[in-house]
Every structure is written in structure tokens, then in C-alpha cells.
């Protein structure tokens, strides 16, 4: 088999995928991340086997400015605002350790959403957003979201004296073990007032907060996706971000959900690219390639081209509309979420298919847990569970777009 030019594969995708950053800030982030890739790759097998978040690498990232990547420059960060560039950065990390990329997404996502709160949020929430962003930019705050409930609903209640208390349990909170703050999705229940949704920001040192050491997932084992228990945690009123009404669809809110989650698509593109790289390296080592192998390789590359193109297109739309508050905000939300869900549906299906085919090409050696393809095989399947919609919810959303409610 003839070895291709080093420019061949990236060149085909240069105008259609996650290949190059679109902003100088995105380039600075990629340059920073390059220094971590060798260690990530070298440690990925042990981190997977032991289900361990590489705390020492995150500590380096905190000190060297990576964890402040999506914080505005005015507040001490790198100023990466492009969703395309964030997705590209996550793809590069995921090619070495997807669990670390998933954990890193937690911090990047919070920077993006808090930046929006700071610039466009209600006057009462802007000081909180600015304070958190400054701490992130200084390397003092590591913030992750806590969304998925365990056995019931996490509830924020307000007592007659005006104080708040948080009770409940969240699961699959990636990076929770090293976080300093948690943005918690809750129901807000107040006497004499309708139930609302809220997102209290809870510090790690808050009384009643317990971070469990219970992560033993099938894949993404280096993400540190543990449970958190809230047992009467006190929350100051000025640390609560208001959200919408439970059970009421608010299409304007789809924009924020898109900004928070769309960059994760880069993780699964990065996994598929890594699987291709491993498979082609093995095929070249063996020499020769039967027709069936060549057909499979061609199909892998065609699917990767489709993934790159779909994801880059959805990210371009999201970047274009993210700060456009000039028109119908519900229409803006739908215009951001719909291409995101088209791309997510394609990524969830075809990234899995690419990894499966790469495992088939490598053969039985890849079925051993010690082989990197085995880890990618497990990691790539996490995409179907990622926010904001799983497969069935995404299908419901897209079918409503096509057929109406």
C-alpha cells in the first residue's frame, strides 16, 4: 500500500471540517494543547483501566491558562469565543483521551455560557457571571455542570427568612472531583409562587455537599463522571441563575443549550479520526490490501468527510447566531438547535460505524482491552447520551421540525 502524502487527508477536509482554527485565539489554544498530547496518549491506557481522571494534567492546564480558554481576554482568559475552535480543540484532545476531552468540555462550556450571561444576562446575574469568569481566568475556579438527577428531582427551596436550601443528587458529573463550583439544574420551589427552574452555583466547600468516588463507566473512564449529593446545602440568593418554567417549551432557550453542548461533537469526530489513524497504521504495517479492505477504507473516509462537513456547518451556524439578539429569539433558538441535532444524529451513528469498521480491519487484536481501539470502541458510544437530547429526544425534535407538533 502506498503511503499517502501528509497533506492528502487534511487537504481534502480543509474547507469542510474541523481541521484549522478560525480565530487567533483558537490557534493559541491549539498551540497550548499540543504540549499535553504526548502525556495524554502515554497515560490513556492506565487512566482507562483505573477509571482515573489525570488530576496532575488538569492542574497543569489550570496553571498554564488552558482552563481559562473560553474566558474573555478582558477577564483574564484566552478569549476563545468560536464554537468551531472549541470543538476542534476537543477533537485534538479526544484523539488521545476522549474522557479527558469530555471533562475539559465542562470547563470550556461554562466559560462560554457565563460569558453570555455576563454580556447579555439579567442585571442581577451579571456580577455573578463576571466573578466566576475572573476566577476561571486566574486559574482559581474549575466549574462543571450538574444536570442529570438520580431517583427524583434536585430541588432548591426558599425558607420564610429568604434563605435557600438545595437537596438532591446528580449523576454523571464529569470532572466533579477537581471542581471548585457546580452549576446545578434544579426546580425552585417557593411558598406562594409557581415552580420555576433555576441553576444555583454551589461552591465545593458548601456544607452538605458530598462528591462521591463512584465512577465505573463502560467508556469515558478518565472523565471522572461521578455523583454529587446535596443535603440541605445553603445557597445565597445572588448565587442563583434564573431559568424557565418546568414543562414549558421555550424555543429561545434552545440557543443557550446549543452553545453549551454543540462543541462536544468534536469529541466524537476526534475519536473516529483516531480509530482511522490506528487502523491505517496497522494496514500499512502489514502491506497489501484486498479489495474488501480497500472498500472499507474508502467508506470510512467518506463517512468522516460527511461528519466533518456536517459538524463544521452546524458550528458555523451556531457561531453566526450566538450573539445575534436582533430578531425573533425563538426562531434563533430553533435555527441553532436544528442543524446541531442533524449533525448530532449523523455523528452518533457514523462515528460509531467508523470505529466499528476500524476494529474489523485490525482484527482480533483490537478486541483486547489493552488495545487502544477497544477504548475508542467504548468511548464513542457515549455520544448518544450527551446533552441536550438523547437519540429518541433528538428524533422527536427533528420530526416535529419536519412534520409539525
Swiss-Prot record:
One of its GO terms (molecular function) is monooxygenase activity. This is Amino sugar nitrososynthase DnmZ. Nitrososynthase involved in the biosynthesis of baumycin. Catalyzes the double-oxidation of TDP-L-epi-vancosamine to TDP-L-epi-vancosonitrose. The rapid turnover of TDP-L-epi-vancosamine suggests that this compound, or a closely related analog, is the natural substrate for DnmZ. Can also catalyze the double-oxidation of TDP-L-evernosamine to TDP-L-evernitrosose. One of its GO terms (biological process) is antibiotic biosynthetic process. Belongs to the acyl-CoA dehydrogenase family. PANTHER family: ACYL-COA DEHYDROGENASE, ACYL-COA DEHYDROGENASE YDBM-RELATED. Pathway: Antibiotic biosynthesis. Its EC number is 1.14.13.-. Keywords: Antibiotic biosynthesis, FAD, Flavoprotein, Monooxygenase, Oxidoreductase. Homotetramer. Its cofactor is FAD. DTDP binds at residues 117, 332. It holds the Pfam family Acyl-CoA_dh_1. InterPro entries: Acyl-CoA_Oxase/DH_mid-dom, Acyl-CoA_Oxase/DH_mid-dom_sf, AcylCo_DH-like_C, AcylCo_DH/oxidase_C, AcylCoA_DH/ox_N, AcylCoA_DH/ox_N_sf, AcylCoA_DH/oxidase_NM_dom_sf.
Amino acid at each position: 500500500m502506498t503511503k499517502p502524502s501528509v497533506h492528502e487527508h487534511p487537504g481534502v477536509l480543509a474547507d469542510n471540517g474541523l481541521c484549522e482554527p478560525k480565530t487567533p485565539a483558537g490557534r493559541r489554544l491549539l498551540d497550548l494543547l499540543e504540549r499535553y498530547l504526548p502525556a495524554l496518549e502515554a497515560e490513556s491506557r492506565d487512566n482507562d483501566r483505573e477509571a482515573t481522571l489525570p488530576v496532575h494534567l488538569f492542574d497543569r492546564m489550570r496553571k498554564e491558562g488552558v482552563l481559562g480558554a473560553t474566558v474573555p481576554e478582558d477577564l483574564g482568559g484566552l478569549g476563545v469565543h468560536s464554537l468551531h475552535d472549541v470543538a476542534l480543540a476537543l477533537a485534538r484532545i479526544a484523539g488521545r483521551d476522549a474522557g479527558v476531552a469530555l471533562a475539559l468540555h465542562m470547563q470550556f462550556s461554562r466559560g462560554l455560557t457565563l460569558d453570555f450571561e455576563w454580556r447579555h444576562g439579567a442585571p442581577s446575574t451579571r456580577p455573578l457571571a463576571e466573578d466566576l469568569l475572573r476566577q476561571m481566568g486566574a486559574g482559581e475556579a474549575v466549574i462543571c455542570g450538574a444536570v442529570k438527577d438520580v431517583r427524583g428531582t434536585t430541588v432548591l427551596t426558599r425558607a420564610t427568612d429568604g434563605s435557600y436550601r438545595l437537596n438532591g443528587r446528580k449523576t454523571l458529573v464529569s470532572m466533579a472531583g477537581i471542581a471548585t463550583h457546580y452549576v446545578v439544574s434544579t426546580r425552585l420551589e417557593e411558598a406562594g409562587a409557581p415552580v420555576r427552574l433555576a441553576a444555583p452555583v454551589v461552591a465545593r466547600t458548601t456544607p452538605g455537599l458530598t462528591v462521591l468516588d463512584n465512577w465505573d463507566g463502560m467508556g469515558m473512564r478518565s472523565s471522572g463522571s461521578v455523583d454529587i449529593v446535596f443535603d440541605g446545602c445553603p445557597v445565597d440568593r445572588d448565587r442563583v441563575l434564573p431559568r424557565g418554567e418546568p414543562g414549558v417549551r421555550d424555543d429561545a432557550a434552545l440557543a443557550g443549550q446549543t452553545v453549551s453542548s454543540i462543541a462536544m461533537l468534536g469529541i466524537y469526530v476526534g475519536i473516529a479520526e483516531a480509530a482511522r489513524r490506528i487502523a491505517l497504521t496497522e494496514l500499512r504495517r502489514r502491506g497489501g490490501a484486498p479489495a474488501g479492505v480497500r472498500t472499507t477504507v474508502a467508506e470510512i473516509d467518506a463517512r468522516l468527510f460527511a461528519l466533518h462537513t456536517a459538524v463544521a456547518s452546524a458550528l458555523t451556524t451556531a457561531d453566526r447566531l450566538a450573539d445575534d439578539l436582533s430578531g425573533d429569539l425563538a426562531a434563533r433558538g430553533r435555527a441553532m438547535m436544528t442543524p446541531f441535532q442533524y449533525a448530532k444524529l449523523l455523528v452518533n451513528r457514523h462515528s460509531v460505524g467508523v470505529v466499528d469498521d476500524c476494529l474489523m480491519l485490525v482484527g482480533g487484536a483490537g478486541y483486547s482491552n489493552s488495545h487502544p481501539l477497544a477504548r475508542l470502541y467504548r468511548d464513542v458510544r457515549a455520544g448518544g447520551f450527551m446533552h441536550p437530547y438523547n437519540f429518541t429526544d433528538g428524533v422527536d425534535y427533528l420530526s416535529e421540525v419536519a412534520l409539525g407538533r
